């Protein structure tokens, strides 16, 4: 979590404890990372060899697994998640190929679980689509405090933040979103000014990590 009471003097950061991350980091979960103080993210644990890991995830207190995969989504993974005692939510998200209105339609369910906590949000590569999902959550869900900027971990080259793919998806949503979709997300119309402020904040803070 980042706060900047005086942006002229630089960024001030604080990292809240995350009990789920602390419990899970002992296990071989690829790209495991905390999400705020109430969830974790990482690579999709599909395949028979990961069944034991899904059980460990459940045992630490995870209630819902969020799957961001698109064409590589499988019913078998959903069944494995449910057999391990957790709820499963598929919200296909990527940087450009998924229809933007399909993404918007899935946001209320995604936001509800991210607000509630006790989730594991995953994609095939662990960090790239989870970056995009968390960026959408921050920019299009103003109940998230303005200073609670999520860290973009998957879009870095030689330590430098690359925002192009994230910006492209955020921009595609604000350009396509309809008045009905704004109402569904409980966003004011127009939303352009708040969108611009939050996108700028997201990118500025992530350049400081």
Language-model segment annotations:
Residues 126:
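Conserved G/P- and acidic residue-centered "switch" motifs that form tight phosphate/ATP-binding loops
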Residues 123:
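Short cysteine clusters
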Residues 1-120, 132-209:
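Cys-dependent protein tyrosine phosphatase-like superfamily
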Residues 129:
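Conserved lysine of the Walker
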